[in-house]
Swiss-Prot record:
It comes from the Bacteria. The active site is at 52 (proton acceptor). Its cofactor is Zn(2+). GO terms for molecular function: metalloendopeptidase activity; zinc ion binding. It comes from Klebsiella pneumoniae. Zn(2+) binds at residues 49, 53, 130. Binds 1 zinc ion per subunit. Gene3D superfamilies: Metalloenzyme, LuxS/M16 peptidase-like. This is Coenzyme PQQ synthesis protein F. The gene is pqqF.
Amino acid sequence: MTLATRTVTLPGGLQATLVHQPQADRAAALARVAAGSHHEPSRFPGLAHLLEHLLFYGGERYQDDDRLMGWVQRQGGSVNATTLARHSAFFFEVAADALADGVARLQEMLQAPLLLREDIQREVAVIDAEYRLIQQHEPSRREAAVRHAASAPAAFRRFQVGSADALAGDLAALQAALGDFHRTHYVARRMQLWLQGPQSLEALGELAARFAAGLAAGEAPPPAPPLRLGEFTALQLAVSSQPALWRCPLIALSDNVTLLREFLLDEAPGSLMAGLRQRRLAGDVALNWLYQDRHLGWLALVFASDRPEEVDRQITHWLQALQQTTPEQQQHYYQLSRRRFQALSPLDQLRQRAFGFAPGAPPAGFADFCAALQVAPSVSLACQTVSPGEPVATQGFSLPLSRWRRRPESDPALAFAFYPQAAGDLVAKCPEKAAPLLHLPSPGDPPRLLLRPPFYCSPDQAEGLARGEQLRPLLAALRHAGGHGEWHLFDGSWQLTLQLPEPGRRPEAILQAILRQLALPVASLTPSPESIAIRHLMAQLPERLGTSGHQKGWLAALAGGSAEDAQWVARQLSLITAPVNPPMPAPAPCRRGVERLVYPGGDTALLVFIPLPDGASLAALRLLAQHCEPLFFQRLRVEQQIGYVVSCRYQRVADRDGLLMALQSPDRRAGELLRCGKDFLRQLAPMDEATFRPLQQRLAAQIRASRPPEARALSALRQEYGLPELTPQAVDALRVAEVADLAREMTRRRRRWQVLFTTGD
């Protein structure tokens, strides 16, 4: 479905894009400013990044946890910002009826920030901690290596992240520079706004007009200086793990980039990625923007590979093959890109519109685009496990960077095939028997099948990744047939979701191949190491909580579709040799204790999972977590400056519900972080009715909001097997005393906690 969209230029020059999304229960806003790291004064590298942080302190009207960050957290929404080379962006998503209140807060923080000295000092410390983190962040190091190949403008090689050394000196001068930067760039003619929600275009237009009111017009942004590459554009970066090839061309901005991305991400038989995997040349691929100005883009095609020469040659063959695709094939992939975009949340759609890969006009001139891409100025970076040479200092990093001297290779070109293709002789017989299937009928909606291992029995990460590798080409083939499938880790448990095409296009052969694949054994794959300590702990937590052994079988639920659809799916499920929807044995108790995990780097990370006590109210836990989240952030991140990762929230992990505290700090020990978490819970003031009622109302609205089909299917399975699941009735019946009792119980019984931590080098 194409969403009604309108772009308007408001008095003063602000451009607003309004997107009407009927029946949506969420809404989003994104403001983009034409100012980033390349615009900051050379005296204060990192100033644009620092200003991004400071703007969240807001202005005079909204104070403390009523500012955008804390307010969105209390709404159960999401909020963030980013500083790029030539842009900064601020964005949030909330329930649709809260959009206007969020836009009012966004308006004030961007138009009239306080920029107080004590806030500046506080955020300089945070920026410095982030700088120390990013020193060991492998993706950031690799991006910096590519940017080093640019000879102009000089900002590409300049330090941009910010640090205490760069920013903490003359506080008065820094405050003045921040004010000057804000007055120059945060003006109507250098700002764009995107709003998306179920509101009418007229109502969204009124919101945009209110946002623009009071903005100084300012001057239009100057054109970007020409981007020129240096003498050496084939580079090699010595790495300890995760070898890769980065192929990074400079291209004129075009809607064809999104179409190229769809061809690139395809994993069906005949695709580039299927061929590379078959020859063991590459594992994964990603397409990212390194840089964008008004007319030019710098793309990064990133392949996980230890054979960069062979992959680079196959990319060239692939670009040649793309020039021969037919208009019908290009239209097919264009429609796939639209389906990929429409599946995103409102906020992610706006992010793609502002600086990503939102589909634009239908394909035009794609062959010429691919031909131009093949000869475009480009940087190649081979990340290889070789002995590091002399380091190169660039952008605040010390990188073992050298010239890449390619080895000769002569692999034959892959045989590429593009879709749609004739069905051929692929015919499948429908089984006669039917397996048990839990069905949530909704004849007007397409059937969505959820398959997952029995509760508390999810495979570990290595086995789950291997299963995903087996399913990749089949799920891609399903996508070309009009369906969609995804094998992914959800709340610490692996699950498969399959959206099936309409009855006249049922791809029985593909579905049966997928189901048969589930019965085959898999060889474990070693997960890629996480680049941030707290993410490493999160990846390890599901296995640390324990499982109930390895019960064979699969749980299956179908959301949507008719009784006839359910009968057809149940017959297909009979092909699974393991039991479907088997009885569940009593779960093993949740593991507890304190464990240190080895992780390289200088930071300390702490993860505390406090499980919901047996028989306690899940509704009380959810409400308690909503209450704690902004208070925890305010106390430990803003007031105590513990570190840059500060989170306390409800989390389901490997089918167990609990309260999760996550902290990462460059200078605090694990014991100190744990003590901070304990003190927060011990000193949490008893909740009164005035605090309780708005939280209860918000939780009731969340549980009554429409949910994706796979979420409804999982909820039905949990209820079928007697696991805790949030219901509107439980939220309505909740009382403040239950929340207070639960808080005391979870705080007091600390021996039931599961604590994971890493310590710095």
